[in-house]
Amino acid sequence: MSILFYVIFLAYLRGIQGNNMDQRSLPEDSLNSLIIKLIQADILKNKLSKQMVDLKENYQSTLPKAEAPREPEQGEPAKSEFQPVTAMDTELLRQQRRYSSPRVLLSDSTPLEPPPLYLMEDYVGSPVAANRTSRRKRYAEHKSHRGEYSLCDSESLWVTDKSSAIDIRGHQVTVLGEIKSGNSPVKQYFYETRCKEARPVKNGCRGIDDKHWNSQCKTSQTYVRALTSENNKLVGWRWIRIDTSCVCALSRKIGRT
């Protein structure tokens, strides 16, 4: 296409020169030489362009081909959001802010006090924190109104040796005890609340009419996020059940209205 354009342009230029009687026409050899040079330049340009394309294709062919994402076949488990145990890193620990619960603590030392949200509970602490715990108990008793009693007696404590739990799917999972993070490993601690006894009084819960009702104190559970592994393979944050309160369960006695 470029060669044809050059020929047409030169023919047009020569026609203009022929009409101009005041100027001498170019010699025939000079015009032919100009046409040959233009054709050679165009051929060289096309040749260089083709060489550049070949080089680009050869370079791309040497690069490793990226594999397209493979769809899981029928019966094959989908990709899990949990990581293998060998691949666990600090990213899981960074997610604690998003999954944090006041009842779950990651620390390199055993906690001596209850979480700030649960200072008013009957905390069972270690002897080191006995004085501070007793002060908080006196403060809680001072704030309560005289003559008020709980239906059930409960106690709260930091569980330091939790090894297994039931997750939200009903599967038993392993609770990670020690987690390697940098130079100092951290452990998981769970602040749990449970009933001291099923029957604080002879016939059941305190203050319940035992003529018409059967009553019993039962420990209630709720879900919190914790670092766990399933089948000792996949590590991640899962919802697990822990003891969080003590409630009074009632049932009407048969034959009573």
Swiss-Prot record:
Coiled coil: none annotated. GO terms for cellular component: axon; dendrite; extracellular space; synaptic vesicle. Residues 1-18 form the signal peptide. Residues 19-138 form a propeptide. PROSITE patterns: NGF_1 (PS00248), NGF_2 (PS50270). Disulfide bonds join 152-217, 195-246, 205-248. Keywords: Cleavage on pair of basic residues, Disulfide bond, Glycoprotein, Growth factor, Secreted, Signal. Residues 67-79 have a biased composition (Basic and acidic residues). It is found in: Secreted. Seems to promote the survival of visceral and proprioceptive sensory neurons. This is Neurotrophin-3. It comes from Felis catus (Cat).
